[in-house]
Amino acid sequence: MTLRWTKEASPRWDADKRRLFGPAELAAVGLAPPGPGELVADEWWRVTDGDGVVGYGWLDTEWGDARITFFVAPGRRGRGVGDFILEHLEAEAAARGVNYIYNVVPETHPDGPWIKNWLSMHGFREAPRGQLHRQVQATPTRAQARASDSPR
């Protein structure tokens, strides 16, 4: 499986996002469903393979840190797509000089315990206000090298 990481120049709420981000998932991270075709905030990347869109990564840089969120198509979970997205989001954060990446998993999230465990296994530590954070790697990875070369 060859995964591709593509930045969305003008991210909009479309059928693929609706398919992956159900109302419960959006509500769990404090977002209301946008209208069809509506612009969505911050930076978005889509992950594709030969079968189409299999995931999304989202990054919001603020005060030297970056909040990240990512979604993987249910049929593709457990196959490395989440690892791929996390590696690329960290590369994007490093290219922007970010110190920490973090994710907030609300208590109401339908898969909260599983996600917290997965993030913990990937080096994230719990912090106040329900955040799980991890320091951005100083040593560039292949994904970071690609991110620094990609257009913003």
Residue positions per predicted region:
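Compositionally biased, non-globular sequence tracts
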Residues: 12-28, 45-47, 86-91, 124
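Short amphipathic alpha-helix that is part of the acyltransferase structural core
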Residues: 1-35, 145-152
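C-terminal "cap" of GNAT-fold acetyltransferases
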Residues: 120-152
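Short, low-order "capping/linker" segments at domain edges
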Residues: 110-119
